[in-house]
Amino acid sequence: MAQTNGELEHSKGMSSPAVRISQAQKSTKLTVDPESPEQVANGTHAEGEQPEENAGGLFQISVKLPHEPYKIQVMVSSQEQVQDVRQSIVELPSTFQYTCFHLEFNGKRINDFVELSEVPDLKADSEIVLVEDPYTEKEARMHVVRMRELVGAAGDRVDNIQGVNAGLSLHDAIAAEAAAGEASEKEHSLSKYEIAGSSSLKTILPRPETPLPKTVKSIALSPWNPAPYHLRQKGHLLYLQVTTNEGEQFQITSHVSGFYVNKCSNAKFDPFPKTIPKKRSAHSLLTLISQLSPSFNSSFEALQEANNQKDLLTTFPFQNAIPNNPWLVPAPSSNVNAHQPDITRSQENYLISGVDNAETLRDWNEEFQTTRELPRETVQDRVFRERLTSKLFADYNEAAARGAVLVARGEVAPLNPTEERDAQIFVYNNIFYSFGADGVGTFASEGGDEAARVAVGKDVLGIKAVNQLDINGLFTPGTIVVDYLGKRIVGQSIVPGIFKQREPGENQIDYGGVEGKDVVATHPDFVPVFEKLSKALRIKKHPVWDKEGKRHDLEGSVETKGLLGTDGRKYVLDLYRVTPLDVMWQEEEGSDVYPHRMSILRLELVESYWRHKMSQYVKAEVERRRVAKEAAKKEQSETAEPKEEGAEEKSEEALDQERVDISGFSLALNPDVCSGQVPQTAEEKEQWAQDEKEVRDTCDFLRSKVMPELVQDLHDGDVGFPMDGQSLSQLLHKRGINIRYLGKLAQMSKEKGARLDALTTLLVQEMIARAFKHIANNYLRNVPAPFVASCLAHLLNCLLGADVNANPRAEIDSSLREVYPEGDFSFEKATPASLRADIEKQVTIRYRFSLDAEWYNSLRHLQLLRDIAIKLGIQLGARDFVFAKADLPKTPVSNGVNGAGHDDSNSNKKKKKKGGDSNSPARAAVEDKPALSIVVDDIVNVVPLVKDASPRSSLAEEALEAGRISLMQNQKQLGQELILESLSLHEQIYGILHPEVAKLYHQLSMLYYQTDEKEAAVELARKAVIVTERTLGVDSADTILSYLNLSLFEHASGNTKTALVYIKHAMDLWKIIYGPNHPDSITTMNNAAVMLQHLKQYSDSRKWFEASLVVCESLFGRQSINTATILFQLAQALALDQDSKGAVGKMRDAYNIFLQQLGPNDRNTKEAETWLEQLTQNAVSIAKHAKDIQARRLRRINMTPRTLGTRVQPQVGQTAPESAGAKDASNTSLDSRSIDELLKFIEGGDTTSASRSKQKKRAAASNPKLRGSKKSSA
């Protein structure tokens, strides 16, 4: 796309991936442009790109305009389409007013959909002409919507899938605080920070902002709209009403020729031009308003200036992703979310989609399938196809989620109103909806509603896997699952022929089980495509038998169905059984029966098991060859003449390099074992038994290898530690572990002792939160909509607020209750005791784990509240939530609010311990009510939770993987080129705001950091923070890691005070989502300590080292090498703080531990001994070493893999080599900016550095939690 200030592409050359990839081998070094896009727009070249070289078809053209400034320059690429150039023009500040126009070259109109390379004679410095077009009604409506957004007259749209503050980013507010800190000479941001202090909920709330300059009072449709028939004949399209800042009201006619002021008043209709005092008209509404309002131009410039102060990413609209909805939002009474009057809000649907809404009705299924059939031969074809696919999935997911919410609320009429509620089906916006419940008894033998609910969730995962494989000739319907108010709703695009009445004797399904497993259909046309699918998913071709015992050979599970659509396409449906059942789980006796028989293995596990078996095969093959080689050598030595030594070495080398042929290896699992199939012959029974053994081996692999390895990795600190329920779930899923194993993992974690207390706490909390979710969903399913908040508040009080009120009563409006005589109000009967019993039962049944006797007394209330809110889609209004009677304010509580905004300095400290602060004012007192932790008014909103089947871009991932491989092979330039290409592809295909793009920003920022391009690293890390906040949440675990990365890069760039602000924010977030003393916070505290040393704040630095030591001792014990490493660092810090006595004491402790753990000859021990002697002998050596210490500590921190974000791609559970993406952990973790210093340091003959690096290798396996420290102390 053409470069504009409205688009965030890194360098113009990236717009032509076909050229770039083909030239990758010979291309020159390309650096990412970390500057704002405006600087690359309008004729400016990104570094490394020369226009005369026309690299990637890049050149500059001029555009002649009908109005000021009459001519602009635009950088374009020969690969992009004319419509991309149009978009560039629309986004440039000097050409904002144009929306309805076409482009001409040499007097001929250029088609919008051709590439620039196809325009005859168009070359560098050519001039194209912008010609204004007559408006149509649709163009006029779009123009009005666009102008309202530009001049800031558009208020917030009320949206049923985007909640309050959707897509919020706090980065700008934090950055402003950092900028103020950097500019001032005052104390740094950590000077009075309480490391073990309580969390403040203000951390995750938007900061109050200065209102933007107002350009007009309103732009709305006039009451005279729409135009009567006889005036439509004369070109009248719309009638508008504009009120300027001066208070004047103008009636405006939107005409095919443009906009003009008419003679209408509120009482008189005369839509013809007003000529007195003079005729006012313009092609653009923006130009017309500037003629009518004297203050408009200055206020519009002020608005643009104010918008330019913000990072463009924070205001960029979402295109290919659904924004994150924060769980905590400002209270409705606060000024931040005050509801403003805006008459046009109710008119926007008409402006966007016309009178009958027909413009937004799409044939989703046909769009999906025609997109899938697009050519994919060239790179350019693939870019276009994947870009379209990504946009289509995003549009469908949004439309389907909206419809699902309406279905859940009962606002869509069912197609079969006489059926039971769970069996009803709906069609809305060309999307077919049904409930994720067993309305027709399909899953009666599998567990009924529970099984159906799980099946539709697994179906989406299966469809996502098939979409990712992108098999030619196999089609899937667009599918989405939405959880909302206790209901699970499935939305699917309508497959042609799915509702068709078949002839007698014909099956509704063409391949697979028909209505269960009693009838099985086969069709020769499905065999080739299902064969490809099964091969990719490791599914074994196997026989199944129908109710008459007849054998049918199927490529997939009997549950997976093939349907030949009336459009001639082959569709695959019901993909919830693409992996086998977890046989061991089913057979394992729990105290209660598991709720369903849909407990299947994860695809990640099957892939992991396949790699494991292949590895065994390769080892066996290598061993077989070695034995054969030795036997052959023995024969040769007896018979043949002796070879020359060199020739023998060469032949051996050739044999070593020979690759093992894995074509003889195959592993495929039968998904239908243990599912009621009855083999008929002895041979079939034998084969079936073999299939069952393979599945059992896979289950055993999960239990005996995957789960123990994960627990051990977390115990040893080999991987990033999860912070909350979401990051824990991601970690388990990545390893192929199902959530039902939370209980087993908790038992294994407990057995490991105190070091994994943090993991045990997280696992138990996740089980409780999920049990509560199931219970709440059961209550919510039939609760009338106005009582949802009452139900949720009451259940939360029973779980979290029993100490404040042991017998909470649901707040229900009795007069409103009478309106719903058939509503289900059973939630009222819930008590703290009954809810605890229900949770214990759910945990026992679902996770086969017994909670401790008084588990409810050790809850982490705020963290559990957050987890539950995220799982149920609740948005809570912020205030001081009180969960303990001791923290209640002493004054009488009005309206059950518990003193929100209560300003008692004595109780404030106590209150903050549990909940945090709030800037919302106290609500007006109405009457005294019993104290409650959560009141109905706290439940501001409930948002739908969406599970989609959108595939990732294979092209962008291929470019990224090629870049990584090149870097691993030390082809730095090519690797950078390919990774930049991948970034361009990510941005083109996904759009800017997407979690996948955020991950890539992380990785790329790390790459630039390692290559000493610090500014680019900081810029990309900043983008990673904003995109992560907006797509994953302002307090997600990924956001914390993004801020920590950014802090390191800022520090490396010399902005240490800024870095400390980001660390402070990350620590504050940590307190909210996990609480204090997270295992990974040790490294962060060390970072902070080193940065403070850099600022010569030795006293504060020492406090952070001491805090790090406390956490380390609690996790690893007093006598661990990790603790010794921190003691060593702390002793140095004390020396810098002139505390020689303390320094000697800590260094002695470190020496004793090293001596005990590593022995007297280890270099760690020797170095500690040397330091100890020097510190003890005299204070002179302290002064002598002071400068060395500071410099060396800085190097240490930069060598810390974990600190530098070895998890640059922010996934908890990633190991160091994985995240580095280029080299092994020890290499990637080096701070490239100090590589030269390091070399000088080592060459200078200082033994301490060398000795410690060797120790690190010895100690890493057993104590990698502080690998950074070990390196540094190494």
Swiss-Prot record:
It comes from the Eukaryota. Residues 342-586 form the Clu domain. It comes from Aspergillus terreus (strain NIH 2624 / FGSC A1156). One of its GO terms (biological process) is mitochondrion organization. Its main location: cytoplasm. GO terms for molecular function: mRNA binding. It is found in: Cytoplasm. May associate with the eukaryotic translation initiation factor 3 (eIF-3) complex. The keyword Repeat applies. This is Clustered mitochondria protein homolog. Coiled coil: none annotated.
